[in-house]
Swiss-Prot record:
<keyword id="KW-0539">Nucleus</keyword>
<dbReference type="GO" id="GO:0035267">
    <property type="term" value="C:NuA4 histone acetyltransferase complex"/>
</dbReference>
<dbReference type="GO" id="GO:0005634">
    <property type="term" value="C:nucleus"/>
</dbReference>
<feature type="compositionally biased region" description="Acidic residues">
    <location>
        <begin position="393"/>
        <end position="408"/>
    </location>
</feature>
<feature type="compositionally biased region" description="Basic and acidic residues">
    <location>
        <begin position="151"/>
        <end position="172"/>
    </location>
</feature>
<comment type="subunit">
    <text>Component of the NuA4 histone acetyltransferase complex.</text>
</comment>
<feature type="compositionally biased region" description="Basic and acidic residues">
    <location>
        <begin position="300"/>
        <end position="309"/>
    </location>
</feature>
<keyword id="KW-0805">Transcription regulation</keyword>
<feature type="compositionally biased region" description="Basic and acidic residues">
    <location>
        <begin position="225"/>
        <end position="254"/>
    </location>
</feature>
<comment type="similarity">
    <text>Belongs to the EAF7 family.</text>
</comment>
<dbReference type="GO" id="GO:0006338">
    <property type="term" value="P:chromatin remodeling"/>
</dbReference>
<feature type="compositionally biased region" description="Polar residues">
    <location>
        <begin position="98"/>
        <end position="107"/>
    </location>
</feature>
<dbReference type="Pfam" id="PF07904">
    <property type="entry name" value="Eaf7"/>
</dbReference>
<feature type="compositionally biased region" description="Acidic residues">
    <location>
        <begin position="213"/>
        <end position="224"/>
    </location>
</feature>
<feature type="compositionally biased region" description="Low complexity">
    <location>
        <begin position="87"/>
        <end position="97"/>
    </location>
</feature>
<feature type="compositionally biased region" description="Acidic residues">
    <location>
        <begin position="280"/>
        <end position="299"/>
    </location>
</feature>
<feature type="compositionally biased region" description="Acidic residues">
    <location>
        <begin position="255"/>
        <end position="264"/>
    </location>
</feature>
Amino acid sequence: MATLDENNPSKQTHRHWSIENEIKLFSLLCDYKPAGKNKQHNIKIIINNINESLDSKEEPFSEYDVWNKLRSLYDLEKIDQIEELSTENTSTEETTNQVSSGSANITKDTKNAKTTLDAKEPIQDKKEMDKEKSESSSLSTPEPPQRRTRSARDTTKSKRNLRDTPKEKSQYNDEEITSGGAEKSKVEVSSTSDHTDDQSPTPGSTKKGLDEQTNDDMSDIEDVDKDKGDETIAKIKKENTSEQEEDKNKKQTEEEAEEEEEEGDHVSGDERESKNKDTSEDEDGEDNEDQDEDDVEVIEDSHTDKENESSSEESSPEPMTKRTRQRTRSTHEKTEHTSPNIKKRTRQSVKFDDKPAEPSDTGSRKRRAPPGSVSPPHPPKTRRRTRSVTHEIEEEDASTQSADDAEPEIIKVETRHTTRRSSRISMEPSSSTPNVRVRRSSRKR
């Protein structure tokens, strides 16, 4: 509240502002500026807002108090100048905006007019070109369009290159379309001429007719391009499928050839195994023959030794004939006549520990082929030695004579079963035969 000074009563003193009131003043200044044309109206609003927040005990603020406080803080004259300049600028901007909007409308109108003129010009140019082409085509015969032949390289293109084919074909398809377009233009020109004769030409009707013609031409061109593009794609697909089928057939033939080679290898391996088995069986048969021959030689050697001993006791010793591996029949007969009392021993006559002699089956020693072998078993190649009838008659006569003259000598000989490795027969001296010699065969294996 303003108070009068005692020394100078005409002057009013400044009112004291609290911090809360100053804060309210500053916040209101942000919304309502006390400058420019509306400064009085804004000051009233500020005063009313401040007085509403005061208590009933405090006096309300006057307009003078608010202006004094603002002058102490701000330079109000400069603020007024700035606000005036800003208002002038805003007014000029508004005027310029109005002018620019008017000019923009004018330019739009001019542009629209230009576009309409530009659209009319190409239509007229097209008309003239169509007329010239129709005249030239009527004078000269139309040449058939040359079709482009596809090379072998084009057929082997990948699927990625399929996108490029319609573009390439559209270039040389334009030539074909132009000839068709010329014929269409003839028909269109004739139809338009008929209409113009019947009806009076108007600018609106001419524009519509030209637009419809251009749209029809473009649609026809697009249809032709689509049809040809579909045909080319179908051809390329057929070629790709044929190539895939050829590749499959080649792979199948190669696989069949490989299978035949593998079967031939298996058959050759089986033949080799059968041959190896045959050779092993042949070797086993030869070994059995050798063993049989060795056994016979050992028995013959023992027989000749005993004959020599008996002959030395009865008569003077005779020179021994040199034994060879192959004995003739004459030597056997001589030995039999010189010693009639001694019983000739063979495989069947020799007694081993009072047991009947068991004939050795050479076929039992043969190796058995495995069950998986393919080749059939071969017959044994060993020769079985048979005794003639004359030898049996001579032995019976000798046995009857020896039974009358002297007691038969029974020699017990312990032998081992002949095996593949045994090349000798161990002979132990017994009481009945004190001097029994066993000689090793000189045959080399």
